[in-house]
């Protein structure tokens, strides 16, 4: 193994990133070194690349970017048990303390001292990466790397869709970005019908159809609530899944969901949102879930089994694959333009 590696690094507190050569890291106690086989771009990575307000308060350059990954263990640090060289793995990004009130109740996904791998630490946009052993997930060999790298965001989608019963339920999904597209795939694989998708981008509406959406709506040109009511015989949808983070989409979804229906919110909104709680939530007796992270490790088991079942139609979601990191700037600019689903760097 070479002592040097290539990595996409946020070198300066400004727009963009650089492709650099750095030393291959060494695993310390409780850590493993993995060789990257595939890694995918997340919206968080795009925020770091763009150097938005959130990134400016959270990221401390120089830092290797990336956190969605599939790889092979090539070295194990002192004190690590249950993980061996040659294991095919992915990584849970939430590094939890195990000591706080939430962790002691088994609610690791809301650990009060969470650090994010690839945000608060160096990440996986590199040929090798050091990972906390406690965050390693062993993959079955029959899941290809370009799928295995998607398990972290797929876990977000699974928790959003499966927060309540979904089989045989009518569903409205607002936002068909990468996470919304994964949500469509999970809903269809889990027996939802019809799955209605509201998305302003024609490119993403077409992707939604390919993934399995039964109806697509352009919210800029059509009345979302009217369309949903027409499709559902005036009843509204049983389940509303919000992936966009758009306040208007939230309001439309709450209007379109049936009384005593279920709502799952994953999209992040730009600040405070004004909602008529009395008429849209309380008097409708809605059950509303806020979704963050993934349940450790229940969600990972669900994701892995869904992938192994062959029922998840995620091929259309992976719109761009790059061999290595050389065209990383093109990849990020395409994502900025909204012209991608998931973008995967293949290093195998």
Curated annotation (Swiss-Prot):
The protein's role, per its UniProt record: Catalyzes the NAD(+)-dependent oxidation of L-threonine to 2-amino-3-ketobutyrate. To a lesser extent, also catalyzes the oxidation of L-serine, D-threonine, butan-2,3-diol, butan-1,2-diol, and propan-1,2-diol and cannot oxidize other L-amino acids. Cannot utilize NADP(H) instead of NAD(H).
Cell location: Cytoplasm
Signal peptide: none
Residues noted as binding Zn(2+) 1 in the record, renumbered to the chain: 42, 67-68
Biophysicochemical property: pH dependence: Optimum pH is 10.0.
InterPro entries membership: ADH-like_C, ADH-like_N, ADH_Zn_CS, GroES-like_sf, L-Threonine_3-DHase, NAD(P)-bd_dom_sf, PKS_ER, Zn_alcohol_dh
Site (Important for catalytic activity for the proton relay mechanism but does not participate directly in the coordination of zinc atom): 152
Entry binding sites for Zn(2+) 2: 97, 100, 103, 111
Source organism per UniProt: Pyrococcus furiosus (strain ATCC 43587 / DSM 3638 / JCM 8422 / Vc1)
This protein's name: L-threonine 3-dehydrogenase
Listed pathway(s): Amino-acid degradation; L-threonine degradation via oxydo-reductase pathway; glycine from L-threonine: step 1/2
Single GO cellular component term: cytoplasm
Transmembrane domains' residue ranges: none
């Amino acid at each position: 193994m070479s002592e040097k590696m290539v990595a996409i690094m946020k070198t300066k507190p400004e727009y963009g990133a650089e492709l650099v050569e750095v030393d291959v890291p060494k695993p310390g106690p409780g850590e493993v070194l993995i060789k990257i086989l595939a890694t995918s771009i997340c919206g968080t990575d795009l925020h770091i690349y763009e150097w938005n307000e959130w990134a400016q308060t959270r990221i401390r350059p120089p830092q290797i970017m990336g956190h969605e990954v599939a790889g092979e263990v090539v070295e194990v640090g002192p004190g690590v048990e249950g993980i061996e060289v040659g294991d095919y793995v992915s990584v849970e990004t939430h590094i939890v303390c195990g000591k706080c009130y939430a962790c002691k109740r088994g609610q690791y996904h809301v650990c009060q001292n969470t650090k994010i791998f690839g945000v608060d630490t160096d990440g996986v946009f590199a040929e090798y990466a050091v990972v906390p052993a406690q965050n390693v997930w062993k993959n079955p060999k029959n899941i290809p790397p370009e799928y295995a790298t998607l398990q972290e965001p797929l876990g977000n989608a699974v928790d959003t869709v499966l927060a309540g019963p979904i089989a045989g339920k009518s569903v409205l999904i607002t936002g068909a970005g990468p996470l919304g597209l994964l949500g469509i795939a999970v809903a269809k694989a889990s027996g939802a019908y019809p799955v209605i998708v509201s998305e302003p981008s024609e490119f993403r509406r077409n992707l939604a159809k390919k993934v399995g959406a039964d109806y697509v709506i352009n919210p800029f040109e059509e009345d979302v609530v009217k369309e949903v009511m027409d499709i559902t015989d005036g009843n509204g949808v049983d389940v509303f899944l919000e992936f966009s983070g758009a306040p208007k989409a939230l309001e439309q979804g709450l209007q379109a969901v049936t009384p005593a229906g279920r709502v799952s919110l994953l999209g992040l909104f730009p600040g405070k949102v004004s909602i008529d709680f009395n008429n849209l939530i309380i008097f409708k007796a809605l059950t509303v879930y806020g979704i963050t992270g993934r349940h450790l490790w229940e969600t990972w088991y669900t994701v892995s089994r869904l992938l192994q079942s062959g029922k998840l139609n995620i091929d259309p979601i992976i719109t761009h694959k790059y061999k290595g990191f050389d065209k990383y700037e093109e990849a990020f600019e395409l994502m900025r333009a909204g012209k991608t689903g998931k973008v995967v760097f293949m290093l195998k």
